[in-house]
């Protein structure tokens, strides 16, 4: 049993995108499902669905074609993922102090009283919360 399901999810996504996999299986939790919805809405993954028989989320990656001098290569839309608030050290912020990731190119995912939100949504609603992770 994994204690930190969010870190496990981010690690699985990072490892699968580094080896250019098309899909990755992630254990289903409501939190992982909400994070996957945000990743899909923000354009970091192509789609996701729940595999009923194994209780796993299947994430389909989105890749960009990158031309080099001699070939075309696939480059993941996800450059990096970083867990910020950890079980041993929780990081909280209010709505005025929510940091920007790469000048707005990346996103923060926050757990707020309204639900799981991106940094832009939290600023617009004027709510703060626990900073779960950053993605760019």
UniProtKB/Swiss-Prot annotation:
Gene Ontology CC terms: chloroplast; ribonucleoprotein complex; ribosome
Gene Ontology molecular-function annotations: rRNA binding; structural constituent of ribosome
Coiled-coil ranges per UniProt: none
Domain of life per record: Eukaryota
Statement: the UniProt record of this protein carries the keyword rRNA-binding: yes
Alphabetized Pfam families for the sequence: Ribosomal_S8 (PF00410)
Annotated keywords: Chloroplast, Plastid, Ribonucleoprotein, Ribosomal protein, RNA-binding, rRNA-binding
Subcellular location field: Plastid, Chloroplast
GO biological process, one term: translation
Role noted for this protein: One of the primary rRNA binding proteins, it binds directly to 16S rRNA central domain where it helps coordinate assembly of the platform of the 30S subunit.
HAMAP family given in the database record: Ribosomal_uS8_B (MF_01302_B)
Family: Belongs to the universal ribosomal protein uS8 family.
Assembly information from the UniProt record: Part of the 30S ribosomal subunit.
Protein name: Small ribosomal subunit protein uS8c
Species this protein is from: Tetradesmus obliquus
Gene: rps8
């Amino acid at each position: 049993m994994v204690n930190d399901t969010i870190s496990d999810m981010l690690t699985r996504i990072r490892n699968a995108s580094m080896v250019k996999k098309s899909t990755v299986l992630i254990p289903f939790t409501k939190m992982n499902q909400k994070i996957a919805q945000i990743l899909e809405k923000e354009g970091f993954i192509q789609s996701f669905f729940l595999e009923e028989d194994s209780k796993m989320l299947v994430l389909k990656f989105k890749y960009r074609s990158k031309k080099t001098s001699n070939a075309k290569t696939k480059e993941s839309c996800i450059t990096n993922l970083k867990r910020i608030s950890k079980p041993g050290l929780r990081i909280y912020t209010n709505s005025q102090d929510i940091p920007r990731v790469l000048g707005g190119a990346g996103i923060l995912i926050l757990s707020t009283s309204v639900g799981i939100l991106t940094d832009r949504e939290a600023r617009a609603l004027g709510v703060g919360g626990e900073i779960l992770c950053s993605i760019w």
